[in-house]
Structures are given as structure tokens and as C-alpha cells.
Amino acid sequence: VIHLRDRNIDMFKKDLILRNPLRSFGRGGEEILAAGCFGAVLAPAGVGKTAFLVQLALNAMLQEKKVLHISLDEPVTKVSLWYAKLFQDLADRANLTRLDGVLEDLLPHRFIMTFKVEGFTVPKLEERLTDLTAQNIFHPEMVLIDGFPFGEADRERLMALKLLAGRLGVYVWFTVHTHRHEKPTAEGMPPALARAGDLFDVILQLDARGADITIQPLRGIASDAVENRLRLDPATMLIRDEG
């Protein structure tokens, strides 16, 4: 028996998936990253890195994929608010009404984990993940790490994380905090990724110019596929396609 409520929720999900602007990356319904791969979203503070990651997560959750959101900056309650706000804004933009129960239907596909920056280690993360999976509580397919402290000593930690991602069969998105005054390296990378940029398969930069925020691919996606098309709306932080 298919209940009307369940059918409506499925319709809303499919509608939001089809409206996802990131489909213009040319990968159809597939994720941007493959299992074991790293992606990075680069921007200065306040430009929209967390909002971008949450929208990646919501799109995966709409496809019933399990998302582990690791925050090194914010408590669980604040991360949860990001999801609620951006989901409502996505629905409003799509003129979808009567959304009772839709977000609640998605939440079992998300698990939020928080660490203090100084307390975040790969062995500690692996221990907590092992507890989740061994007890059959949560088996992530996508991992977000918001607030990772990129620096000179962190290549080894990133290499250990990549090995862990490969063993678990997950792909990982990071936020990377950049500074407007910093000059890129000869390879076009920000200094924060100077020693570890080669570990990343996809790198996207949020480029704020005035009131406009463009999404520029630096690696892993053909730039002509999204040339000046994808934006972050500075009012809502929603990704939009102007192609």
C-alpha cells in the first residue's frame, strides 16, 4: 500500500533533485566525487562555505544517501539550523508547499558529529565511526568536514583521512578557509592547500566580488561546463544556475 503522504514526499524529493543547480557540472544524477575521493570548497570567512556543503548534503539526502556532517566550528544545534533554513529556502524557491514531514523524512539520512579543533584526530574519528557502524547506528556514504585546520603540519593527517575514506568507501568534502590578501601558488592553489592540494580530486572556489558570489572550479570539473553560471545567492546562500 502506497500512502498519499509517502507519495507526496517522494514527488517533492524528485522535484528538488531535478532542480539541483549542481547538475550543470555535467554528471547527471551522480555525485561529484567518487568513493575515496576528496573535494574542497574554498572561500574567505562569511562567503558561504558551510551553506554550500549543507546543500551538497541535502541533495545526497534527497537521494537517500547517508551523510556524516563533522563540524569543528559549531555545535549540533547550529548545524541543524543550517539544514532547516536551507531546506526551507530550497522549497520556497521551487514554490513547493505543504512540506510537512519532508525534512523529517530526510533527517535519518544525516548524522552530525562535533569535535573541538584541537581534539580532532584521525584515530579518534575512526573510533567513533567504528562505534556507529558496528552498532548498526549509521553507515555514511558522504562525509563533510567543516572547519578542518589546514596548515603546514596537516598533510600527514589528510593522508590518513584519505586512507580511512578509501577503507570506508566514502567521499569527503572539506571547507577551506582562505584570505583575500593571500596570493595563490604557482599552481593556482591558495596557500592553505600548498602542501596538500594534490590530495584533492575536486576543488571549487567561492569568489565574492561585490554582491556577487561565483562558483569557480579549480580542479576536477571542466571550467567551461560551469563558466560564470553557478552562483551563491548572497541573500539566501542558495546555489543558483544562471546558464
Where are these regions (language model features)?
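Short, Lys/Arg-enriched N-terminal segments with co-localized hydrophobic residues
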Residues: 1-10
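Pre-Walker A adenine-sensing motif
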Residues: 18-32
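Pre-Walker A (Motif I) flank of P-loop NTPase domains
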Residues: 34-39, 65
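The conserved Walker
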Residues: 45
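Conserved glycine(s) of the Walker
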Residues: 48
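Conserved P-loop
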Residues: 51-117
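Phosphate-binding/switch loop-helix module in NTP-utilizing enzymes
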Residues: 110-170
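Phosphate-binding/switch region of NTP-binding enzymes
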Residues: 177-243
